[in-house]
Regions:
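Hydrophobic beta-strand anchors of alpha/beta hydrolase catalytic cores
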Residues: 68-69, 96
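Aromatic-flanked redox-active Cys/Sec active sites in thiol-based oxidoreductases
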Residues: 70-75
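Thiol/disulfide oxidoreductase modules built on the thioredoxin-like
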Residues: 113-118, 125-175
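A short beta-strand-turn-helix
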Residues: 45-67
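Short gly/ser/thr-rich secondary-structure transition/capping motifs
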Residues: 27-28, 48-55, 122-125
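Structural microenvironment flanking redox-active thiols in thiol-disulfide oxidoreductases
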Residues: 80-116, 126-132
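N-terminal targeting signals for export/organelle localization
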Residues: 1-48, 175
Length: 175
């Protein structure tokens, strides 16, 4: 009798793991990691220029008025998709400071030449140190920073046309 029971044990284990896998596949998952830095001041940073066309970026650049901080990269396909919306925000008077992640100067310049340049400054974060310090987990991500340098809002993923009013409203709230 004991030997027969052991013959069924592999089948029972397989059924258990198959059931567990099936259950996990039916559960909702959160694909976005929200920053724990919302409501906190930007960490101190001073990044060199991402290319020769614009100055670098630092925490001091966020004083005075609300601004957008856009985390992006030339190798990021969703960053191409959001380029027209960033241009639209710039056309409405929004100052956008960029941080290019793990990028080369020539690639940054080429990207901006092809898709437009909505940025007043772009810092080069070659090892993603600042990106991680502000709680960004990917590219693109955009943060609303208030006039005192406090992170007020995080937009995860590329900015779509339908997201522009929300970002403008968050900038207004950050006054």
């Amino acid at each position: 009798m004991g030997k027969r029971l052991w013959l069924w044990a592999p089948l029972a284990l397989f059924a258990f793991f198959a059931g567990l896998a099936g259950y996990m596949l039916t559960q909702d998952k959160d694909e976005f990691v929200e920053s724990e830095m919302i409501g906190q001041p930007l960490p101190d940073f001073a990044l060199p220029a991402a290319f020769d066309g614009l100055p670098g970026a630092s925490k001091a650049d966020f004083a005075g008025s609300p601004k957008l901080l856009n985390i992006w990269a030339s190798w990021c396909l969703p960053c191409i998709a959001e380029a027209p919306q960033l241009e639209a925000l710039k056309a409405q008077g929004v100052e956008i400071i960029g941080i290019a992640i793990r990028d080369r100067p020539a690639d940054v310049a080429n990207f901006l030449g092809r898709y437009g340049n909505p940025y007043s400054r772009i810092g080069s974060d070659r090892i993603s140190e600042v990106q991680l310090a502000i709680g960004s987990s990917g590219v693109p991500e955009t943060f609303v920073i208030d006039a005192k340098g406090v992170i007020r809002y995080q937009h995860i993923g590329d900015i779509r046309e339908s997201d522009v009013p929300k970002l403008l409203a968050e900038l207004e709230k950050a006054q």
